[in-house]
């Protein structure tokens, strides 16, 4: 009976791996990304003359990922650069505006906007003519962040695009523009009968990011979905809301049956400055709870554990990062590198 229950749980959460890495957005679709977080540029750019061997290894992992043959690894690397404010890598990110893969170009444009990397402004003007509208929307966002605010209108208009990926990406970007006037557009996208589920969920998360408390009941329902992948996506959106009620809901998910859900909740709590999930993460890495999982599930859990460590950053957890930096999976290594750089910033 116990083995059957374990098997059932594995089957029920098996589609998580498909929904997180190849999810709603054209970019930031890494296993650990559903939209990258606001960077802390002022403190994130490490002084390479005074770093530990572990930090040096983390930087090398990101450097390698930027030129990895796997486009998803390149997207992951860009997300880490933004989140940790590694400006020194931005010339390489700028070159990715010419990458042959659309998600990479999209991620590069977003990164330039997020970090307000003005040396890339002339390159962005070319991205505004990209063959893919998703890249054009991302470039418009970046141009707006660099002072040419008229381009934000391109993002606003994209929310009404018939292409559901374009619409979802527009919702994602609207949530990053820090303009509460976008709430009306996001609510429309969420409620429009032609919007797909991915658009509705992205609109909900964007509304949460903009501090719209009205989304809480809807997100609550998603967090308690029967499907683990839905719960994880709901947890990310709840974390973006960043209220005391959101925190309380996240704490309840530390008791979830599925390891990945518990780790995702611990990560979001860490972002809110709450270390309640530390023991869940510690148990996962100390007791090696990924043992017995298939390779895909193990990779997923290790990525989520590394991300949670990067938000909580206690010595009891960070001591596991050196081993995670040596994991056979490049995605686990990138997530661990992100955690190392994040903890250096705190």
Model segments located where?
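Bacterial lipoprotein signal-peptidase II cleavage site
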Residues: 37-44
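Short inter-helical turns and helix N-cap capping residues of alpha-solenoid HEAT/ARM repeat scaffolds
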Residues: 69-70, 100-101, 131-132, 162-163, ...
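Amphipathic alpha-helical scaffolding segments comprising HEAT/armadillo-like alpha-solenoid repeats
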Residues: 38, 52-65, 86-98, 117-129, ...
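C-terminal motif of bacterial Sec signal peptides marking the signal peptidase cleavage site
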Residues: 33-35
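Bacterial N-terminal signal peptides that target proteins for export
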Residues: 4-24
């Amino acid at each position: 009976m116990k083995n059957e229950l374990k098997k059932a749980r594995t089957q029920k959460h098996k589609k998580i791996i498909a929904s997180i890495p190849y999810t709603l957005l054209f970019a930031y679709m890494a296993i650990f990304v559903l939209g990258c977080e606001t960077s802390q540029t002022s403190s994130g750019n490490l002084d390479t003359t005074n770093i530990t061997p572990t930090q040096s290894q983390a930087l090398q992992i990101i450097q390698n990922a930027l030129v990895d043959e796997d486009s998803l690894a390149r997207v992951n690397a860009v997300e880490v650069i933004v989140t940790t404010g590694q400006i020194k890598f931005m010339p390489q990110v700028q070159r990715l505006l010419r990458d042959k893969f659309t998600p990479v170009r999209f991620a590069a444009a977003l990164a330039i906007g997020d970090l307000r990397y003005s040396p890339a402004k002339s390159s962005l003007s070319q991205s505004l003519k990209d063959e893919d509208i998703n890249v054009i929307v991302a470039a418009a966002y970046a141009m707006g962040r660099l002072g040419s605010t008229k381009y934000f209108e391109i993002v606003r208009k994209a929310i009404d695009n018939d292409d559901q990926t374009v619409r979802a990406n527009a919702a994602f970007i609207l949530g990053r523009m820090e303009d509460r006037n976008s709430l009306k557009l996001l609510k429309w996208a969420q409620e429009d009968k032609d919007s797909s589920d991915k658009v509705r969920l992205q609109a909900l998360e964007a509304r949460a990011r903009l501090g719209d408390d009205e989304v809480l009941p809807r997100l609550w329902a998603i967090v308690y979905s029967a499907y683990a992948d839905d719960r994880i996506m709901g947890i990310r959106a709840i974390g973006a809301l960043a209220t005391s009620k959101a925190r309380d809901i996240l704490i309840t998910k530390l008791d979830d049956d599925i390891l990945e859900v518990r780790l995702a909740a611990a990560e979001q709590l860490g972002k809110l400055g709450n270390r309640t999930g530390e023991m869940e993460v510690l148990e996962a890495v100390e007791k090696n709870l990924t043992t017995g999982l298939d390779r895909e599930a193990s990779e997923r859990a290790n990525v989520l554990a590394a991300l949670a460590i990067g938000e909580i950053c206690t010595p009891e957890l960070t001591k596991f990062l050196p081993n995670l930096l040596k994991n056979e999976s490049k995605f686990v290594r990138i997530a661990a590198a992100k955690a190392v750089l994040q903890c250096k910033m705190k």
